[in-house]
Swiss-Prot record:
The keyword Aminoacyl-tRNA synthetase does not apply. GO terms for biological process: negative regulation of translational elongation. Keywords: Translation regulation. It comes from Acidithiobacillus ferridurans. CDD domains: RaiA (cd00552). This is Ribosome hibernation promoting factor. SUPFAM superfamilies: Ribosome binding protein Y (YfiA homologue) (SSF69754). Belongs to the HPF/YfiA ribosome-associated protein family. Long HPF subfamily. GO terms for cellular component: cytosolic small ribosomal subunit. One of its GO terms (molecular function) is ribosomal small subunit binding. InterPro entries: HPF/YfiA_ribosome-assoc, RHF-like, RHF/RaiA. The keyword Calcium does not apply.
Amino acid sequence: MQITITGQHLDLTDSIKNYADEKIGRLGRYFDHVSNAQVVLKHLPHEKLSNVVDITVNAPGHVFHAEVHDADMYTGID
């Protein structure tokens, strides 16, 4: 599975990239044919829940999408 992790309005550290890669990589345990996943991590400084995690997972015949707003980026990834 190919995982693409990008950031908007924040500096992506190796720690956050590795954490997201590890968590999204676990999808392979549940879905055999996941082809790729796009993870977009955003920081919105003027919002109460300022971190946004947007994940899109592609599998043959299906597209799964989730978006979470949270005060903590790691919690949002979970």
